[in-house]
Amino acid sequence: MSSDVSGTESGSESGPESVPEPVPEPGPEPESEPGPGPAPGPGPGPAPGPGPGLGREPGQRYQPCQLCPEHGKPLSWFCLSERRPVCATCAGFGGRCHRHRIRRAEEHAEELRNKIVDHCEKLQLQSAGITKYVAEVLQGKNQKAMIMANATREVIIQRLSLVRCLCESEEQRLLEQVHSEEERAHQCILTQRAHWDDKLRKLDSLRTSMVDMLTHLNDLQLIQMEQEILERAEEAEGILEPQESEKLSFNEKCAWSPLLTQLWATSVLGSLSGMEDVLIDERTVGPLLNLSEDRKTLTFNAKKSKVCSDDPERFDHWPNALAVNAFQTGLHAWAVNVKHSCAYKVGVASAQLPRKGSGSDCRLGHNAFSWVFSRYDQEFCFSHNGNHEPLALLRCPTQLGLLLDLQAGELIFYEPASGTVLHIHRESFPHRLFPVFAVADQVISIVC
C-alpha cells in the first residue's frame, strides 16, 4: 500500500480516483487465557523493552488505540496540514482532509521515535561533556584559582610590608630632620638672644655713664671728658639694629619628601568622596572661547564671538575663563580632560586677577594672582608671577588633576590615571581661589 493517501510527501495533490476505500482495521487481539507467571504486583508496570523513546521491537505492528470521534474508526492516518491523527474516512474522498497532505500514523510515529532517539543521544553526549567539564576543567580551574590567590596574597603582603618599612624609615628620617632643624633654629635663637642681651647691657652701661656725666659734671669737666663722650657715642653707634634672618626661622623644606607627597596625594585622592563639581562662570569666558550648555567644556574659536564684553567679570582679550567655585579653606580636587588640546593652561587664580586688556597682567601665570600648569605643543611648565618653571614629562597627560590643600598651602598637579605627581607648588595663598582655565587649541573639558 502507498504511504500517502492524498498526495505525496512533497505536498502534491491527487484526484478522487486515488483516494483509498476505507478498509477495516484489525481489531484488538482476543485476550489470552492467563497462564502461570509472576505474582501480580501493586500495579501495572511498563512492558519490558528498550525503554522510552528508543523505538519498537522489529516487526511490531502499529495499532491505533483511539477512534475517530466523527466516524468511530481507528486513527490510522496523520494529517500533515492540520498536524493531527485522522481515520481513513477523514482522509478519503469527501473527508475533511481529502485535499490535505497525509501519511500513515505508523510512519509518522516511527519518525518521531527516531527523532527522540537522536535527541536522547545528543542529550547523552551533552551530559557527558558537562560531566567531563565539571570533573576536569572546573576542578583544574579551582586548583589554579587557589594557587593564584595564594601567590597574589603573598605579593600583596610583600609589597605592603616593603611599603610599610619604607614609610617607617621615611618617617624616622623626616622626624629626625625636623628635630635637627628645630634644634638648629633654637640654638640660633639662643645665640641671638645672648648676643643682644650683651648688647643691651652694654647700651645700658653707656647710657648710664653718659647720664651720670650729664648730671654730675660741670662745664669744665664735660669739656675735659669730650673725647671719652665721643668714644662712648661711637661705641653705641657700632651696635647695629637687629636684622631679620632666615636662620632664625624653622625651614619647612626639611620635611619635604617626594615619597611622602606621592603617598599622601594618592591616599587623599582615594579617600575623597568625589571630585568637586566645578562649573565655569559664563560671565568670565573670553571672546575666543565657546562654552558648552553644561558649563564644563571650553572650545577655542579663532573668530571672536559676539559676546558682550562690558561685563566687568569677562576677559575681553585672552582666552581665559574662571569657575564659579570659590575655595578659601579645606582640601579640594578636580580634573580636566586635556587630551584634545596642545595649548592650554589649568590652575587657580584669585578674584583680583585683571580681566581687561591685552597686557601680561591679564595673562595666566604672568602675574601674582594666578598659578597655572601650561602646555604649548610639547613643552610643559608651571607659571606664576612671570616665572616659568619647565617640567620634564615622559608623556603628554590626557587628564590633568589638581589637588588644592589650602591649610598646608599646597597646589598639586597630578595625572589621575596613574596618580603620578607632576608638580607641587607651596605657598601661603592670601585670597580666595577659583579654578581657572585657558585654551588656545581645540577643546578642554572638566571631568564630571
UniProtKB/Swiss-Prot annotation:
It is a peripheral membrane protein. InterPro entries: B30.2/SPRY, B30.2/SPRY_sf, Butyrophylin_SPRY, ConA-like_dom_sf, PRY, SPRY_dom, TRIM/RBCC. One of its GO terms (biological process) is cellular response to leukemia inhibitory factor. The keyword Transport applies. Predominantly expressed in testis. Expressed in brain at low levels. One of its GO terms (cellular component) is perinuclear region of cytoplasm. Residues 1-18 have a biased composition (Low complexity). A zinc finger (B box-type) spans 63-111. Residues 19-51 have a biased composition (Pro residues). It is found in: Cytoplasm; Membrane. Residues 257-448 form the B30.2/SPRY domain. One of its GO terms (molecular function) is ubiquitin protein ligase activity. May regulate epithelial calcium transport by inhibiting TRPV5 activity. Interacts with TRPV5 and TRPV6. Interacts with YWHAZ/14-3-3 protein zeta. This is B box and SPRY domain-containing protein. The lineage of its organism: Eukaryota, Metazoa, Chordata, Craniata, Vertebrata.
